[in-house]
Design a protein with these regions (language model features):
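Intrinsically disordered, low-complexity activation-like regions
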Residues: 1-173, 194-541
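Nuclear receptor C-terminal ligand-binding domain
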Residues: 182, 186-191, 230
């Protein structure tokens, strides 16, 4: 079978997760169709040019890639994949999709499939002895397969289309140009956490500003523009998380305008591959804002302390179980309730019909409860990992680092109130949050074989934060191995090379902090850990 990999590579992928191995491959035609050269056989009739319809092979490749996208990419871009997944492409209307969008979907699907096919080979880099995963800007270039030239061909066509859109005055600030640039940003992140995504982020920012700003576009109620804005918003926020405080500028403060839209276009995180509840994403935004404000020596430290305490309280008081219960039921209920809902036109029913419908509703409710129970605990653990990761980011940057840098020890910084009768010092709160994060991650990854509904594949950022906040000593070796091993597996699950880039960065941080003899209170600050000349990475999806 002509495909993206030979049998040995397929076996490698199967070793990672047999239950998730795609049942079919997209056939692409590289040199000689991806097959080994063979001697020509005399007398064998060859097909003549023109027997296939015009563009038949290109159309078939496009449809195959769209089908792959719907079946293997879309399910991993939402908290729970249901029939209502808004990211699925309607194949019956594929001819109405702009060519440039189709080109990006083809490139994305083939890249996803190639990375998954080579996941075992790629993710074992740096596992020999004490060797490290090297930091590479273009890890994608090392992958080999017949689909590679096809991927770059379609990617090049996309870039040409972008240039054409931007060269025309009437379209350079249009919906299509904005959507293409934001999608290209996601494609760059898929291929490398160190890729050219910052350039696309700034280009999208310029278009949004030209069109009246984020608030104006977010209230247009255009579903396609809304999806693009969500991706832009998330990358902008998480880019600030990974930016040293002294490099932040006034644009960080403008992120507060996103807060009003966390329940509308972002939908409280349930339709995103970064399913961070709105309360917690708002906390990240406000942490970024306080970090940026703290650069100014004229800022009132007492006021910053007060705001920092409020942020901590909002994170610590968040109820992950309640949030999960609400959203899991919302996500699972449409498919179950549709078949059992009584007709609104049927108003005249006798008592037996009413009893029958009542029994049907009881059965449907029981089925819904069973479905919710099957995934509720798993999704709760994922939500808790995000909550504890945000808590660690808050404690590290607003409490531990600011106290060290300012030399102050005010009551707000010296202790953190978890309840009316219990106070923990910041160091103890940090250790407790890290322990809870690791415990939730272990519970989540213990059910890795759950199948397609397993949401542990969305734990990229919590894993990275756990790694950032660990001491490099021998007592944490097992947990560091767990974090790195899980990130390596995400290369396969997500069809994304960024998790491997995250491993390389964490290993570098651990090595630097170990050499510096930092542990406990003497650990490097958040900003000091981010100082990597020439490296600008993003590690959350």
């Amino acid at each position: 079978m002509s495909g993206l990999e030979d049998d040995s590579h397929n076996q490698h992928a199967l070793q990672l997760l047999p239950s998730q191995q795609p049942p079919q491959w997209i056939a692409v035609h590289g040199p000689n169709g991806g097959r080994r050269p063979r001697a020509a056989r005399p007398g064998v009739p060859r097909p003549r040019a023109g027997l296939d319809p015009i563009d038949y092979k290109n159309h078939k490749l496009t449809l195959d890639c769209l089908d792959y996208y719907n079946n293997f990419v879309c399910p991993d871009m939402v908290l729970l994949d249901t029939t209502a997944n808004p990211l699925r492409v309607p194949l019956e209307f594929w001819r109405y999709i702009p060519d440039v969008v189709l080109d990006m979907l083809v490139s994305t699907s083939l890249t996803h499939q190639l990375i998954r096919a080579k996941a075992h080979e790629v993710s074992t880099i740096g596992m020999e002895g004490n060797s490290l995963v090297p930091i590479k800007r273009h890890r994608m270039s090392a992958l080999q397969g017949p689909s590679v030239p096809v991927i770059y061909k379609y990617h090049q066509r996309t870039l040409m289309a972008v240039n054409q859109e931007l060269s025309k005055t009437e379209s350079r600030y249009g919906d299509l140009a904005l959507g293409i640039i934001i999608t290209l940003m996601r494609v760059e992140i898929q291929q490398s956490a160190f890729g050219a995504w910052p350039a696309h982020l700034e280009a999208a920012r310029a278009i949004i500003a030209q069109r009246g700003g984020f608030n104006r576009l977010a209230t247009m109620e255009d579903v396609y523009v809304g999806e693009g804005l969500v991706n832009f918003m998330l990358v902008d926020i998480m880019n600030s998380v990974m930016t040293p405080t002294w490099l932040m500028d006034e644009r960080t403060a403008t992120q507060t305008e996103y807060i009003a839209h966390l329940h509308t276009i972002y939908k409280d995180g349930r339709d995103s591959d970064f399913p961070c509840p709105a309360t917690l994403l708002e906390a990240i935004i406000r942490i970024n804002d306080v970090r940026a404000l703290s650069r100014d020596e004229d800022q009132d430290e007492a006021e910053l302390d007060r705001v920092s305490g409020q942020i901590f309280t909002s994170i610590a008081s968040f109820n992950a179980a309640d949030w999960t219960r609400t959203h899991v039921r919302t996500l699972l209920s449409p498919g179950v309730l549709t078949t059992s809902s009584p007709s609104s036109d049927d108003t005249a029913r006798d008592s037996s019909d009413e009893q029958l419908h009542s029994e049907s509703r009881d059965v449907a409710d029981k089925g819904l409860d069973d479905a919710v129970a099957a995934v509720h605990d798993m999704c709760t653990d994922l939500t808790k990992t995000i909550q504890y990761a945000v808590l660690l980011y808050c404690l590290r940057t607003l409490h531990m680092d600011r106290r060290t840098s300012s030399g102050m020890s005010s009551p707000q910084l010296a202790s953190v109130w978890l309840s009316d009768d219990m106070a923990l010092d910041v160091e103890s709160a940090h250790r407790s949050a890290l322990d809870m994060l690791l415990a939730a991650l272990h519970r989540l990854w213990d059910v890795e074989a759950k199948g397609k509904d397993w949401c542990g594949k969305l734990s990229f950022w919590p894993l990275f934060i756990a790694g950032m906040e660990m001491d490099p000593g021998p007592e944490t070796q097992a947990e560091r191995d767990f974090v790195c091993g899980s990130l390596r597996k995400l290369v396969y699950y997500l069809g994304d090379l960024s998790p491997l880039d995250a491993v390389s960065v964490l290993q570098l941080i651990w090595r630097r902090t170990a050499v510096g003899g930092c542990s406990g209170r003497q650990r490097f600050s958040w900003d000091e850990r981010l100082v990597m000349p020439g490296i600008r990475g993003l590690y959350f999806f």
